[in-house]
């Protein structure tokens, strides 16, 4: 039996050695057809041209996990139609003592994901809840930036990749 895409992303998030200065650890896993295409993690003290272009907070001094995942493959793979699963966990999170929290992509990350054609973002809300953001039909804010609404929220047990 195949693992759900959310479980796969949680495993990647728990296996990574994060910078000790980070209060929360964020992992973004891009999937196409149920296969892992790229994995990105938040890092402290770095920035990227892609992130500078889209950022909404001038004081942000880290690469966000979603941006890192896109940067890893943006010149190698067409991400149109892909999904991203974003997991945020506290440092003392474990399978026996889960501490998953809100990982909704920020406005900057939403714009990056939309620009590269990703269709959906699934993200943790709590240990037992997740949100789903449709990235294909944006509203525009007063600055012309895309903004997306969540269309579902539910139990983590239903996060199978329905495209397979």
Question: How would you describe each model-predicted region?
Answer:
Residues 1-164:
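Zinc-dependent deaminase catalytic domain
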């Amino acid at each position: 039996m195949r693992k759900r895409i959310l479980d796969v992303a949680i495993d990647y998030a728990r296996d990574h050695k994060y910078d000790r200065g980070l209060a929360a650890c964020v992992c973004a896993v891009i999937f196409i057809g149920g296969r892992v295409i790229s994995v990105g993690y938040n890092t402290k003290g770095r920035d990227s041209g892609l992130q500078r272009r889209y950022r909404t907070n001038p004081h942000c001094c880290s690469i966000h996990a979603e941006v890192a995942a896109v940067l890893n493959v943006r010149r190698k793979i067409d991400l149109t139609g892909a999904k991203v699963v974003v997991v945020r966990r506290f440092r003392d999170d474990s399978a026996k003592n889960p501490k998953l929290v809100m990982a909704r992509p920020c406005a900057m990350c939403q714009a990056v994901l939309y620009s590269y054609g990703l269709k959906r973002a699934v993200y943790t809300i709590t240990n037992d809840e997740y949100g789903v953001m449709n990235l294909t039909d944006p509203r525009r804010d007063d600055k012309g930036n895309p903004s997306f609404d969540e269309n579902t929220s539910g139990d983590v047990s239903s996060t199978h990749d329905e495209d397979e």
